[in-house]
Curated annotation (Swiss-Prot):
Record-given protein name: [PIN+] prion protein RNQ1
Glycyl lysine isopeptide (Lys-Gly) (interchain with G-Cter in ubiquitin) crosslink site(s): 5, 84
Annotated region described as Disordered, given as residue ranges: 149-172, 185-405
Keywords assigned by UniProt, alphabetized: Amyloid, Cytoplasm, Isopeptide bond, Nucleus, Phosphoprotein, Prion, Ubl conjugation
Note: [PIN+], also known as [RNQ+], is the prion form of RNQ1. [PIN+] is the result of a conformational change of the cellular RNQ1 protein that becomes self-propagating and infectious. This conformational change generates a form of RNQ1 that assembles into amyloid fibrils. [PIN+] promotes de novo [PSI+] formation upon SUP35 overproduction (cross-seeding). [PIN+] can be cured by GdnHCl and by deletion of the molecular chaperone HSP104, which is required for [PIN+] propagation. Present with 1140 molecules/cell in log phase SD medium.
Organism, as annotated: Saccharomyces cerevisiae (strain ATCC 204508 / S288c) (Baker's yeast)
Keyword Cytoplasm attributed: yes
Amino acid sequence: MDTDKLISEAESHFSQGNHAEAVAKLTSAAQSNPNDEQMSTIESLIQKIAGYVMDNRSGGSDASQDRAAGGGSSFMNTLMADSKGSSQTQLGKLALLATVMTHSSNKGSSNRGFDVGTVMSMLSGSGGGSQSMGASGLAALASQFFKSGNNSQGQGQGQGQGQGQGQGQGQGSFTALASLASSFMNSNNNNQQGQNQSSGGSSFGALASMASSFMHSNNNQNSNNSQQGYNQSYQNGNQNSQGYNNQQYQGGNGGYQQQQGQSGGAFSSLASMAQSYLGGGQTQSNQQQYNQQGQNNQQQYQQQGQNYQHQQQGQQQQQGHSSSFSALASMASSYLGNNSNSNSSYGGQQQANEYGRPQQNGQQQSNEYGRPQYGGNQNSNGQHESFNFSGNFSQQNNNGNQNRY
């Protein structure tokens, strides 16, 4: 529709007392990209409607609350401010007028009038007062108010045109605008309640939640620190145990493994164990004592290593000569074994004569001089032939006596 025609209809509605319909027509005119002259006419009509609202504010308790909140003055200051040639600012003023009218009509017939203070307090975001809105605030208000209203407004205009010109067109246009105002107020009420809860009632709850999280995190951290301390103590115990084991193993075996009798890290293991045991808190004398013990153990392990080395060398030499010596040992063993058997047989058959000389034959008989007498002649087949002898042998001693046997 033509902008001039929309402005003309708005003037007609205002003169007839249809202020809501006048606001709807001015809104359509401001959205139709008006020129400067048209914007000036729109601005003049906005101020006239604002004056009417101020003259018809709600009475009773609402009026007292409105005056206490300063809603009237802030409302008029906002609508009387210069729009500075911005159609978006004018749309913000028209949105404010539509919100006041919709809010007041929803309160019922018992309280006829416009509740300006409540709307201004709602828009300013403070429950105890209201503030004037500048050009930028009005532009933001228009953007929020009409963000989903272009289609709804077009539908309202279409419905009004379908019902016919005159009453149908005007009625349909403000219905869509009132719907936008209701949605806008509901969204602002929810936002305000959320802000009040965040800044008021739930502020301590937020602090309590933060404190609970903080204490819980500290408890976990302290528990983790305690656990880490326990693990560290256990780890230190394992390190000390490993140091002691390394001392014994490396120190004990170091001399054996080194060809020159060196300790193979025994002293370093002792020093590491001493350092773990001291923990940086013992005196230097204790450190020197551990160093002296380490040196003594080192010398001991070196001596053991040398002894073991000499022992190994002796075993190797013995094994090197084992081939020649084993032959001698075998011969000696055989010799000793044969002699042992011979002595057993020889000694078992001997009969001692009077001079103690052994007889060389088990069948030999000794004479008076102890000379062995052979029991017979040996023939070619190895048999002895004996002879019989009867008689006595006599011997004369130095005294001339003759002894007979």
